[in-house]
Amino acid sequence: MPEPLPTETVPPPKLEVEETPQEQPAIGWIQVITRCAGNARALAGVSVLVTNGTEEQVHLEHTAVTNESGETGKIPLPVPAASLSLNSDETRKPYSTYDVSVYAYGFYRQVSEAVPVFAGKTSRQIFHMIPLPSYLQEPPKTIVYQNTEPNL
């Protein structure tokens, strides 16, 4: 019978990995406010979607519904660290952009595109909800607001 081989524990080789400092993601917020009747009345029960990505691949980040004051709570969203704005050689934007869509029965759908969100700050999006004419059951189109990205 063959003699068993001695068992010897060999530690795995140590890998030399050069770590590059990574910016820790930060948090910024979006708060949605909905009004109607020429800003005279808050609109409760409005569905809110916060998305990002491209037309081909949209990522749902958050959903909410407005309260009796016509507002959502502050919606936390991942954004780059504010320290990016301190480096003049940095090519990445020191903020993220999100699309905010609002839906309510009897009103036109609206979307605010490319809403900039910065670390530690709240971007307030105010929507003036427009009622549908009585002969329409569904809105024929979505009202789109294009935001201009900050020139930093």
Regions found by a protein language model. Name each.
Residues 1-42, 58, 64, 137, ...:
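Beta-strand-rich domain onsets/edges
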Residues 114-120, 128-132:
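Short beta-strand edge segments in extracellular beta-sheet folds
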